[in-house]
Structure formats: C-alpha cells, structure tokens
Amino acid sequence: MIKTLASVALSLGIAFGSFLPVLSIVPLQVVSPDRQEELGLDEQIWRNSGQKGDRQALLTAIDHSMSYLRSPRAITAYRRYPVRGITRDRVIRSLERFRELVLSSNSPEELQAAVREEFVFYRATGKDGRGTVGFTGYFEPTYTASRVPTQEYRYPLYRLPPNFSRWSRPHPTRLQLEGADGLSGDGRLRGLELVWLRYRLEAFLVQIQGSARLQMTDGSIMTVGFAGKTDRPYRSVGRELVNDGKMNLAGLTLPRVIEYFDSSPEELNRYLPRNPGFVFFRETGGAAATGSLSVPVTAERSIATDKSLMPPGALALIHAQIPFPSRNGELEQRQVSRYVLDQDTGGAIRGPGRVDIFMGTGTEAGERAGRINSNGELYYLLLKN
C-alpha cells in the first residue's frame, strides 16, 4: 500500500555505472547483540501466555520477500543500494537460512541463539546517530462505502487521473483539489470518483493508511490500494493540533485525533487541508493489503521504512513497544523483540530514525496501530560472510 501515514525518500546523489549513490548520512552500523539479553527473543512465534503463535505468518512474510527479491525490480534496487556489504544475494541467503532456523527451532531461546551465532546485526543509526528509532503503527481500515453518491455517502476516494504524468509541478494542494470542506475542489478530479464514504475523516484516513477494505452498500466487498500521490509533502494533522495547543504531544495517538474531530467536526475544514499531499486509489479485486514492494504485508511482521536508506525485502529485528489487549480488555504496552520483513514505505517515513509497523486489518488493528508512538531500535540481520 505505499504507506502514507507515517512515508518517501531522503535525497540521494545517484550516479550510474560503477558508482554507488552518495549518502549524506550513514543509515546502518554493525553492532554486537550481546549487550541486550532479550534482543532477538521473539516469543510471539510460539505459543505464549495461552495465545497461539504466528510462526506461519512469519514464514509467509519471508516468502513474500523472497518473491520480491527474485524480481527484476529488486535487481535494479540493489544495484543502487548504497550500504557496502548488503547485496541482494546476501539478503536472499540470509532469508533462506533464517527460514530454516524458524522451522527447525523449538523455542524462542533456541532461535535467538542461532541468529546471534550466524548473523551480523546492522543497527539503524536512528534519528540521533545513536540508534534511537521512532516507531508508529499503521493498518488497513474497514469502512462502509457506496458506488454512487447519496445524501449519506458524499466523500469520495479518487482514481489516478489519466493525464497525471503531465500535471504541472508543484502539483495542486489538497485544498485546491477538494476544497476546505472536501466537496468543493477546483473540478479537475470530477469524474474520477472511485467510491463515496459516509464521513470525511474516513476518506482522509484511507489516504493516510494507503489502502482499505470497504463494505459496499450493495452487499459486496471492495478493496482499494495506492495508485499514486501528488508531490506535495505529508504534514501530520496530529502535529498541527499539538502546535495549536489542542492536545499534548505525549498523548498524541490516532484514537485521540479521531475523538477530537468527532467532538469538533467543524475543525475538519481547518486542519485537514494543512496536509497538502493527496493520494489516489485503484480497486485491487479483494487482494490483501500490499506494500511498496508489490507484495502483501503481514500483520505485525511487515514494516515500512525509508527505502532510499534501508534494504528492501530484508530481514529485520525491531525492539519496541507494542500495545496488546489485557485481561480486562484494555490495551497495555509491552516491550517486544520481533523479527520482521521490510516491505513498505510511506510519505512520512524518512531517514534512519523512523519505522511504521503494519498491524493488520480492521478496528482492533486500528486501535493498536494508533497507540504505537514510542522510541525503540531497528536492526537488519545478514548472514556472516
């Protein structure tokens, strides 16, 4: 879904032929994992605390990355990848070996020991040069929509204009395209409506997440995915609310933002246009949510990063806080060490200090994704040469 919530690339100087891109920053550094005892101890793969493990989901995510890595697109991407020592062949061999270890290991401890023995840990240098990475979450929302506009369903998602490649730059802003109220743009999108949603904030959030599963009023299910975006930068509406004193940065979560606009709907006209970027969609025929590598993303096993800096499709390890339902139904934060695959990107995911975790589809996934907002660490795992 090329992620747009929290996602595309820092500037690189690209030189073709035998030269690599020139990096203005160093995104990854080799480190020893020994300083953190719990690093690589992924308890979710096996049954834990009475819950079913997700080993098959992890294996499926690995297979999706392998599918990408064998494509011509991956060959091109890795020819230009700037970090010395990280090649497509090494990434493939690393995934093949890790998959074998996941199948042969019988416990988190056994897998952790094998990974520490056989793999090199490349830590993201983070937003401070010392490995501090900011984590957020994203999800595939589910909403009700209509194939035709009605009094109830008024807010459209739009197809990519057929002449989009010929639009003059910079592209029009969100305000120009859809108006302050989301319904009174300059007319250039007229006739490109794909579906209509009931609430304006829902249509906006589909643009933020980059895809959606829609329950149509005629009883059918439609899935939509990213088709393109304007060249305007992403600007966080939540940050705008913080800047204006509407909420505190410490309490900034997606549920809080939704709650604010539900109680003050007149503020939508003021704040949504402050994000000037605009996303277009296509119908995806019921396909699973798909990342920027054109392979499906897997709940809690796929991440989005800046693909100008990080190796696409590669095996990674995150050390971060993720919310889980407690026994009383509330969400509580837990520190986890989780093996993931780097399979997506997004308009606000820039630099070596940002990661977005895909949390799945639907309301619960959205609740959990919206509460991920903390610092952690990101590592890429490559077989020792």
Stretches found by the model and what they are:
Residues 27-285, 292-295:
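Secretory/export targeting leaders with adjacent low-complexity proregions
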Residues 1-9:
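Bacterial N-terminal signal peptides that target proteins for export
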Residues 9-21:
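Bacterial N-terminal signal peptides
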Residues 285-385:
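C-terminal soluble interaction/assembly domains
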